[in-house]
Amino acid sequence: MEALRQRIETAFEARAEITPTTVEPSVRADVEKAIAMLDTGEARVAEKIDGQWNVHQWLKKAVLLSFRIFDNQVIDGAETKFFDKVPMKFADYDEARFKQEAIRVVPPAAVRKGSFIGKNTVLMPSYVNLGAYVDEGTMVDTWATVGSCAQIGKNVHLSGGVGIGGVLEPLQAGPTIIEDNCFIGARSEIVEGVVVEEGSVISMGVYIGQSTRIYDRETGEIHYGRVPAGSVVVSGTLPSQCGKYNLYAAIIVKKVDAKTRGKVGINELLRIVD
């Protein structure tokens, strides 16, 4: 994999000269291999090593190179046609393949090739972009979107209309990450490389980006870009320094451990006790 990484890095430096008609066959083959590795989960844009998330930028570069290498093509749909550079992940699947991978895909869910979908995952009519990683046992509910290179953990529930932001550029930016056993409430948006740590519960209609204040009402601490593990988060406001107005914030109303979360329903966790 190291040799492939180096070749992708070299090709990316010369990306301005690359077009579908001028690309070297070896470069095309390397990019296709990298996309295939993302598609099968053999490689992923980000992975947790020794408790820290590490981003493999060369895989993002491979995705960006694919847009320069591959030309638009007609993609057949059930009742229409599409025209794009990226084929659909399930275009060549048959019943045996779906059963083997133990996934449910409800029409008209759209998943681009180069994204990984783990076993026992349910995709309602939703959208998963290339480079994304959706781990085992996760539910992607109706009209939820998983952006490019986003990382979704095991046993996550992305409720209806949830938006998980994607990131390809700038290259230095990390992907949005939802760790294992999280619940993201309907119409919430988690973007700009925010990390929602394991076992957290995000209420309906919570919007979190890198500049969003995430206020822990028990400790008074303010976090940016990270929801601590086991947090129960709702929408709220915090007063301005002058005291004349309030500005939006995400409020951590309580913390729960896995044992409590297993015994208590999501609705109970979201009931605020002042």
Curated annotation (Swiss-Prot):
GO BP annotations listed: diaminopimelate biosynthetic process; lysine biosynthetic process via diaminopimelate
EC number: 2.3.1.117
InterPro entries with a match to the protein in the record: DapD_Trfase_Hexpep_rpt_fam, Hexapep, Hexapep_transf_CS, THP_succinylTrfase_dom1, THP_succinylTrfase_N_sf, Trimer_LpxA-like_sf
Catalytic activity: (S)-2,3,4,5-tetrahydrodipicolinate + succinyl-CoA + H2O = (S)-2-succinylamino-6-oxoheptanedioate + CoA
GO cellular component: cytoplasm
TM stretches of this protein: none
GO MF annotation terms: 2,3,4,5-tetrahydropyridine-2,6-dicarboxylate N-succinyltransferase activity; nucleotidyltransferase activity
List of residues binding substrate: R104, D141
Record's keyword annotation contains Transferase: yes
Keyword Cytoplasm attributed: yes
Quaternary assembly: Homotrimer.
Membership in a protein family: Belongs to the transferase hexapeptide repeat family.
Name by which UniProt lists this protein: 2,3,4,5-tetrahydropyridine-2,6-dicarboxylate N-succinyltransferase
Species this chain originates from: Shewanella loihica (strain ATCC BAA-1088 / PV-4)
The encoding gene: dapD
